[in-house]
Amino acid sequence: MLDTVALSPEIDALMNDIGRKAKAAARPLSFASTEVKNRALNAMADAILANKAEILAENAKDLKDTEGSEMLASFVDRLTLNDKRVAEMAEGIRAIAALADPVGEVIAAWDRPNGLKIERVRTPLGVIGVIFESRPNVTADAGALCLKAGNAVILRCGSDSRRSSQAIHACLVEGLKAAGLPEHAIQLVPVTDRAAVGAMLRGLDGAVDVIVPRGGKSLVARVQSEARVPVFAHLEGLCHIYVDGSADIEMAMQIVVNAKMRRTGICGAAETLLVDGAAIGTHLTPLLEVLTSAGCEVRASPTVLKVAPGLKPATEEDWSTEYLDAIISVAVVDGISGAIAHIQKYSSNHTEAVIAEDPDVVARFFTEVDSAILLHNASTQFADGGEFGMGAEIGIATGKMHARGPVGVEQLTSFKYRVHGAGQTRP
């Protein structure tokens, strides 16, 4: 938990120095060639694989610190690294290297009647601050994405993932040096003092351009409340699935179980299942059975309890709860209109899915539901930058300014205008 703390002059001095170094590194990064950036990224991936044993050893120490604590299983799962996850981390960095470089891309171009030729061109944001808790893989993902987009990044991990993040960060610095890029392009805050978070939120004397929080609701809420710089964030997942009467029941069963149970502790996990009232007799019971058979606790609305009286009744609080666990709330709704109304009332605007074969139902869902990610006949667990072909993501944003949905390399850029003339003067 990252609570508000008093100002610390020593921490402020340390953090402002980190900010100055990041800002200095951001300039050469902003015009570094694609070849050089990709060389650094591939060297980072090589270093992570070469140092896998050390990374896992440091992660084991972090995990040992959670023993005897009251950490949720989902928290420990996010903290845990293994051979597969380390390999995926390296693969993710290589995937980012393989992406098109957004910097310098001409987004739009047009000619004016007076002969001026105008181009809108992607540019780096500058310095990005990433504050995260139990996900050591964020060190690699955020560092690589920011580098690809020509940005410097300041990473502040939680004390729970400190050792793992330090081991991964050392590999990133090794990659920067191998490509001749400034080592301060990717910095990891060396202290766990919570005052460091406050300093980042104040912008480090103008060094930080954007803050991205990755963590629990309390962290994100604090960042959104206190930050004096723009924030890319979502407060919670709270994803919904609506199963329409037109849905293929076998498909719906597979999708619902995957959306809830594949990984229960991620923000793309489904937390509420809505079933069309017209399909109670055909769809509700099979969906409940497949969920309970998978080990999921179901919290049921009164209408659902009439069909399955042995389930736990849902409270009003359940409809606005992100469980991050093997628990799901289930309600029967009055068709697509009822589903949209429920989602509009309780959604966090993160991700929602509709399972339906009726194109009119799908069209209404896509038009009227105002969440960052909408899926048709697919699991909510696809709400991920890697699955979107972005290589990875630095986070998922649910706001409507600048970035929305998975924040990948393109979303980590701004733009400028280039105007070519031939001696024009304004009358």
Curated annotation (Swiss-Prot):
Function: Catalyzes the NADPH-dependent reduction of L-glutamate 5-phosphate into L-glutamate 5-semialdehyde and phosphate. The product spontaneously undergoes cyclization to form 1-pyrroline-5-carboxylate.
Pathway listed: Amino-acid biosynthesis; L-proline biosynthesis; L-glutamate 5-semialdehyde from L-glutamate: step 2/2
Keywords linked to the UniProt accession: Amino-acid biosynthesis, Cytoplasm, NADP, Oxidoreductase, Proline biosynthesis
Sequence similarity: Belongs to the gamma-glutamyl phosphate reductase family.
GO terms (BP aspect): L-proline biosynthetic process
Cell compartments where the protein resides: Cytoplasm
GO molecular function: glutamate-5-semialdehyde dehydrogenase activity; NADP binding
Encoding gene per record: proA
Enzyme superclass (EC): oxidoreductase
Primary localization: cytoplasm
InterPro entries registered for this protein in UniProt: Ald_DH/histidinol_DH, Ald_DH_C, Ald_DH_N, Aldehyde_DH_dom, G-glutamylP_reductase_CS, Glu-5-SA_DH, GPR_dom
Species of the source: Rhizobium leguminosarum bv. trifolii (strain WSM2304)
EC numbers on record: 1.2.1.41
Protein name: Gamma-glutamyl phosphate reductase
Catalytic activity: L-glutamate 5-semialdehyde + phosphate + NADP(+) = L-glutamyl 5-phosphate + NADPH + H(+)
Superkingdom of the source species: Bacteria
Any one of the GO CC terms: cytoplasm
CDD domains in alphabetical order: ALDH_F18-19_ProA-GPR
